[in-house]
Amino acid sequence: MQFIDLRSDTVTKPDFEMKQAMSIAEVGDDVFRDDPTVIKLEDMAAKLFGKESALFLPSGTQSNLVALLTHCERGDEFIVGQEAHTYLYEGGGGACLGSIQPQPILQNTDGTLDLGIVKSLIKPDDYHFARTKLLCLENTTWGKVLPLDYLAKAGDLAVSYTHLTLPTIYSV
């Protein structure tokens, strides 16, 4: 039996064929959108997920940080499991680079967060508190996939607290 380690992009090791493909891949400067391989990958991902476009990021750490910084502003907070990469690992990037405050809570043995606890941690709309802006769920935790019904309930909870303030509308 062959062991495949999917814990992290940091433990991925390309085999000979992958290294060979990399050595002959057509490359260019992605800043100028001159890298046909990256363009093809982004186009393929956008089509696969039914989106207008996609963005290639070379690591899970960078992807998680971009997601946090996309959804949160300086001084905001995100609710996250204590074992999640965006909290426990990744050098505290959200706090260090984005001035985003994590609000960690215990994860259940199946990787879920108790949604009652999540709801109790959502801060009131009061300038004395960091604004609760995001619920981060890690899929998978300890190799366990979050159940679809749980994700639906978590999504419903998050959406029920979504609102746009007048300044937010004007900054869009």
Enumerate the predicted regions with their spans.
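PLP-dependent aminotransferase-class I/II
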Residues: 98-153
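Single conserved hydrophobic/aromatic residue that forms the stacking wall/gate
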Residues: 163-172
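Conserved PLP-anchoring active-site segment centered on the Schiff-base-forming lysine
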Residues: 70-88
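Aromatic/hydrophobic pocket-lining residues that form π-stacking "cages" and hydrophobic walls in ligand
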Residues: 154, 162
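Conserved core of the PLP fold type I
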Residues: 52-72, 106
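Conserved N-terminal alpha-helix of the aminotransferase class I/II PLP-enzyme fold
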Residues: 15-60, 82-83, 87-88
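N-terminal amphipathic/basic leader segments beginning at the initiator methionine
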Residues: 1-21
